[in-house]
Amino acid sequence: MMKKIAVVILNWNGKNFLDDLLPTLVQHTPPEVDIVVGDNASSDNSVEFLKQNYPQIQIIQNDKNYGFAEGYNRVLNKVKADYFVLLNSDVEVTPNWIEPVIDMMEADDDIAICQPKLLSFYNRDTFEYAGGAGGYIDKYGYPFCRGRLFTTLEKDNGQYDDACEIFWATGAAMFVKAKVWKQLGGLDGDFFAHMEEIDFCWRAKNAGHKVYYCPQSVVYHIGGGTLPPSSPFKTFLNFRNNFSLLFKNLQKRQLTYVFPIRILMDWVAALKFLSEKKPKEFTAVMKAHWDFYRQIPTLKHKRKKINQRKVSNIYNGNIVLEYYLKDKKIFSKLGM
């Protein structure tokens, strides 16, 4: 029996991306695969554009902008498929981008989530920030990728052409078995956006599933989406959500030593923003901590539903120190 696959784009005022990139998506997606656009109450005529130009695409409209996490939850509740492919509107796909990933996931029941190779749309021989060749975190919760440490992006010279287990898959192009999505309750809607895929993958690993990288599938990501590259709101979400995913998923004995160190390191980051004359970014870090503390009762309830366990592919070190003090700028130097 053929598995039913649905490629689902969550759109918010991304008509320009849809106009530019839907043609290649339609061209390179097998006809038996459903293409769905969920719309977060866009005001740029995205829905009208789709209706006029792509009548074959299913449109699911949310009544307001619920953000990436809850927006996807509401849309995917209405999609019937065995596999969900969460695809950003600013991603260009290539020929044969679906088949190798599905083949890999079908061959191993334990693989619940998978990502393709993510390259830069503008620098096409370079890994892209949002996912590269698969995501990892260090023991303090700082995320990085094969092919991308902080702002250092590696050229793709085939060095990461091995399929392997990773810690998290990029939300820009994430393949998920629908039964696992439902088992885990989808993304955490309280995240709104940013790092929700890391939390989702960690919960999947805590539930005994695997997250994988498939280099035979290649996509190109513009990046940045609908928030500007430097945004206090983005800073707020990244700092708050990172604390939230640590609180939810770390084993109890790890929480006691990780959190004090992370609080100290966040203060260092906040003071660095002040020294760079970025007071709004400093304030965003402070607000992130305040909002996290406010949410602790809710997070405790969420934590009780997760079976925290020791999971693979967490870097047992401090990526900040390795990168800035020891000058380890590429993934291979970490010795993972």
Task: Label each region the model flagged.
Residues K139-C145, F150-V176, I198, L227-P229, ...:
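A recurrent flexible, glycine/aromatic-enriched loop bordering the glycosyltransferase active site
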Residues D161-V218:
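A short, conserved alpha-helix in the catalytic core of glycosyltransferases
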Residues V8, A207-K304, Q308-S312, N318:
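Active-site-adjacent helix/loop segment of glycosyltransferases
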Residues V91-Y142:
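Conserved donor NDP-sugar-binding/catalytic core segment of glycosyltransferases
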Residues P23-E32:
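Short, acidic, metal-binding catalytic loop of nucleotide-sugar glycosyltransferases
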Residues F84:
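Short aromatic/hydrophobic "clamp" motif used to bind/position activated sugar donors
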Residues Q61-V79, S89-V91, P100:
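Glycine-rich, basic loop-to-helix element that forms the pyrophosphate-binding segment
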Residues T24, D39-E48, K64:
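A conserved acidic beta->alpha catalytic loop
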